[in-house]
Amino acid sequence: MDLNKIFHLYGPHTPEQIVVHNTSRGKDDYRMVHIVEYPSIGKTAIKIAKNSFTTPERVKGWAKLIEHYCSLGIYCPRIIRNKNGEFCAIIDGYLVFAEEYVKYQTASGIDKCATGQHRYEQKLYESIGLVAANPAPSVPWHTAYCLYDKFDESEEYDENYECALAIRDYYVNHIPKYAMQAKSLFDEYCRRREKFESRYRLLPKAVFQGDINESNILVTKDGDFAGMVDFNLSGTETILNYAFCESFCSLDDDSQIDMLLDTEALKKRDARTAQRLGWIGKHYRFTDIEKESFNEYYNIVAPFRWTYHSFFLSLLKNREKYPEGRKYAGIILDWIAFQMTGKDISSLLP
C-alpha cells in the first residue's frame, strides 16, 4: 500500500503523521485510521479499509447521513472530498476516505468521577428520537441490529437469530443436562419469529448511525453530549428495533448474574430501559402499530439480544475467567424463558 499516494489525495505535501489507530477485526476486516496534519487543512483523519461493508456507495451514504445529523444539531465530523472532488478512492485495492479531525473527546476518555457518570446519556437518547422523527432518505443497507435481513451479505443470518442459534448449539454440544430445554426454547423462538415477520415489515424505519458506544459518543469537557463519530455501521433500521436495542440494559459482569431471576432487580433494569425509551420519546412519538407490536417483538428479540448472549456464552465457556460459570446454565435458560413469555412489556414504551 502506497501511503504517499493516499496522503496526496488531500494535499500536495506529505503530512505530519501524529498517530495510527488499528481497528481491524481479522484478515477479512482491515481498518486503519491515520491522524495526520496538513499545512493547508490542518489535522485530518484518513481512513483506510478493506472489508465487505466499506464500499464507495456506502461512503457516499455516510457522508449524506452525517450532513443530516449535523443539520439536526448533532455534531459529527464530516467526510472530506479528495482532490478529485470525490468522497473516497480505491488505492492499491484499499478504500480510502477522510474525515474532519474531531472537535470533541469521546465518552470513553472522560473522567466520569469529575463530570458525573454518563452525564451525556439523556441528550444522547433524545438525539435518537430526533433522528427518528426527522428521517433521512432510506439507504439500501441495514444496521448490524437488523432483524430478518443481513447487515453483510456474506453472513448467513441476522445477529439475533445467530445469537439464538449459538446458545442452542452450545447447550446441545456441551451441556447435555439442559439440551432439551435449550432446543425447546429455540424452536419456540423460531415459531414466533416466523409468525411476526409480516407485521415487523410494516413498522416505520429511519437511517441511524448504528453503533453507539463510548468510543463513538462525543462529549464536551464537562461531559455533556455533543455528537457522534464513526458511521461505518450506519444504515436503514426499523425505529422500534433500533430504539430498543440501544436502550435495553445488559449485565456488566458475573457479579450481577444473580439478578437474572430477582424480580425486584429486573424491575429496576426495566425502569432504566423505560427511561431511555422515554428520552427517545421526547422527539419521536411511537406509533400505534409500534406500541401494539412491542410485546411480541420484545419476546423475540430480548432473550437473545447480543449484549446478553455474549456475556452468557463467556460465562459458560471461559473456564479460566469464570471457573464456576456453568453452574448458571439453568438460570440463564430460565431467564430466557422468562423474557420470552413476559406479558406486560408494552408499558416500557412512552
Please give the residue ranges for each predicted region.
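Protein kinase glycine-rich loop
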Residues: 21-27
